[in-house]
């Protein structure tokens, strides 16, 4: 959903409010570049000025990095004329700074950093996270993460050769 927000193009038949997007590619940066290029070709778009990509992780559990992220969001707004509406941390494991993902204390610091970024920028913060070995048990690590989430979606594959992506809402607060 990052690219429709950055361009203001409809997503799956729904109107989208345009804004800037910050994509933190903590892993798979080359793959992200390929997917962005494929989307540009498919949608005949060649102006993604509202998409800022960082090829290195940001650690929301680190107060200095939280401040730097907020300042960077304001720089993006100044440059593009659009407030940052979406910040994507891809993935939690890479943006966790070596902390223990099973520790509620460490996860609490990560959540607090994300909340501070969200509150001070007004952006939605999306964290890409991997499930554990048992997919039915949800994401890896401390249970304080799912407890703090407003919304959680699970992405799975289905069908012949696992071609179809299925997006399932597994939690919706309020």
Question: What is the meaning of each model-derived region?
Answer:
Residues 10, 16-100, 105, 109, ...:
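Conserved inter-motif catalytic segment of the P-loop NTP-binding fold
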Residues 86, 94, 105-174:
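Phosphate-binding/switch region of NTP-binding enzymes
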Residues 14-17, 159-161:
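Short, glycine-/polar-rich solvent-exposed loops and beta-turns at beta-strand/coil boundaries
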Residues 2, 23, 90, 149, ...:
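Conserved RecA-like P-loop NTPase ATPase core
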Residues 1-13:
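Walker A/P-loop NTP-binding motif
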């Amino acid at each position: 959903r990052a690219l429709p927000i950055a361009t203001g193009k409809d997503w799956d038949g729904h109107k989208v409010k345009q804004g800037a997007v910050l994509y933190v590619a903590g892993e798979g940066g080359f793959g992200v570049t390929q997917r962005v290029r494929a989307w540009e070709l498919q949608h005949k778009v060649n102006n993604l000025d509202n998409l800022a990509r960082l090829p290195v992780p940001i650690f929301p559990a680190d107060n200095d990095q939280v401040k730097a992220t907020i300042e960077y969001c304001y720089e993006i707004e100044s440059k593009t004329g659009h407030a940052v509406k979406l910040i994507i941390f891809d993935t939690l494991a890479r943006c966790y700074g070596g902390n223990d993902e099973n520790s509620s204390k460490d996860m609490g610091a990560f959540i607090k950093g994300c909340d501070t970024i969200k509150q001070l920028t007004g952006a939605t913060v999306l964290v890409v996270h991997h499930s554990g070995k048992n997919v039915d048990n949800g994401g890896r690590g401390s249970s304080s993460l799912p407890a703090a989430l407003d919304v959680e979606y699970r992405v799975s594959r289905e069908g012949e050769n696992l071609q179809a992506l299925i997006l399932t809402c597994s939690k919706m607060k309020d």
